[in-house]
Amino acid sequence: MTAPALDLVALLRELVRRPTVSGDAGAQRDVLGTLTEVLRERAPHLQVTEGRDRDHPWTLLRTPADPGRRQLLLACHVDTVPATDPAAWQRDPFDGDLDGGRVWGRGGSDMKAGVVAAAAALAAADPGTPVALLLTSDEEIGSQGAAAAAAAVAELPVGAVVVPEATGNQVVLGHKGALWLAVRTAGRAAHGSTPERGHNAVLDLAALLARAGGVLPFRTDPFLGTETWNPGVVAGGTVPNVVPDRAEVVVDMRTVADGGDLLAWWRAQPEVADVEVRVDLPPVGTPADDPWVASLPAPVLPTPATYFTDASVLVQVVRGAPIVVWGPGTPAVMHAVDEYVELAEVEQAAAAFTDVVSRWNGPPAGSRREP
C-alpha cells in the first residue's frame, strides 16, 4: 500500500511544537529521528547515514541512485534560537498555531518551513534521481552540526546545493562569512576605593571598542558589500568595589574574504591580552550566470542574504558546486517575537523543490556540470 503524500501543514506544526534550541542535542536528535521516520514511511528506499557526534547530531538521507552521479543536495538545520521572553509573544511560541494562513511559532520561518518543503521534495523523488537531504543541528551557533557532517558530504559527488533558508522563495546567490572573536583585556585588581593601585581591564576594553569602529581593516566586495562588526556581548568585573582585572567582548564580524587580517588587527592592539576564535566561516557566492541557477523556477535576487547559513561550511567541501539560499519564510521575522511563516510559501517551495529534483539529471562525477 502506497503511503500518503507528506502533509506539509501537519509536519510543520509538529516541528514548531517541539523546541529544538541550539545546544540541546537531545531535542535536535529526536527531531532528526522523527523526520527520518516520516521520510522512510513514504520512501522506504532512502539510505540513511547518522552522525556519531553526540553534541552536534546530523542525518543524511539519499536516494539509492548511482553513487557515481552528481547529487543534488538539500541542506537544512533543525535548531532554532531561543524564544526569549515568551510573555512578549501574542501566542505561545511552541504551540504551532494555524491562523490566517500562517503557522506561528519559533522556527516557523527559520527554518522548519524549509525543512518541510525539502522533505516533501525528497519523499516525492524518483529512487533513480541522485538527490540527498542533509539535516543538521546547531546552525544558529556557528553551523556546528554542518561542520560535524562535512566529512560525509565531502564523500558525495555534489553537483548543486539548495539551502532552504527564509528568502521569501527568491533565489539568493550568497552571503558574507562570519568571524566571531572573544577579545579579552587584563588588568590588576585593587580595592574600588583606591583604583590608582590597580589597572582597570574594563576601561581598557572600553577604549579599545571606542577606537575599533573607525580603524578596523574592513574590505568591500562588489556583490557581498562591506564587512561589518558588532560587539554583541560584553563582560567584566565581579563586584562594584573591586577594580576589574579582566574583561571580555565577543565580536561578530561579517566577512567578504578570509578573516586573517581582522584577527591579526585585534591581536596587535596594545590593550588585548588574548583573542579566542569562536566562529570562522567563509563567505559564499555563486555566479549569477551559472546554468543551473538559470534553470531554477524562481527569481534571482541581486543582493546577498544578510545572515550566514550552513552554506559557509558546505562551500568548503562541495568542490565548486553552485550553492543557492532559497526557501519559504520572511527574513524580517527570523529570530523575532511572533515568528510565523505563510503556508502559501511553504506549498510553493515544496512544489518548486519537487520540480527541481524531478529535472535533476545527475551527470556523472568528473563530467562538466549541466542544469
Name the predicted role of every residue range:
Residues 71-73, 103, 157-163, 180-182, ...:
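Short glycine-aspartate micro-motif
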Residues 37, 147-151, 294, 312-313:
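Active-site phosphate/pyrophosphate- and oxyanion-stabilizing loops and adjacent acidic/basic residues
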Residues 71-135, 337:
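Active-site metal-coordination/substrate-binding segment of hydrolases
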Residues 83-99, 158, 173-184, 324:
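Acidic-glycine-rich active-site phosphate/pyrophosphate-binding loop
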Residues 111-180:
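Acidic/histidine-rich catalytic neighborhood of metal-dependent amide-processing enzymes
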Residues 2-3, 10, 20, 49-52, ...:
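Metal-dependent amide/peptide-bond hydrolase catalytic core
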Residues 59-63, 98-105, 272-275:
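Generic recognition of long tandem-repeat/solenoid scaffolds
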Residues 1-86, 246-252, 263-268, 343-347, ...:
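N-terminal helical capping/dimerization or prosegment-like subdomains
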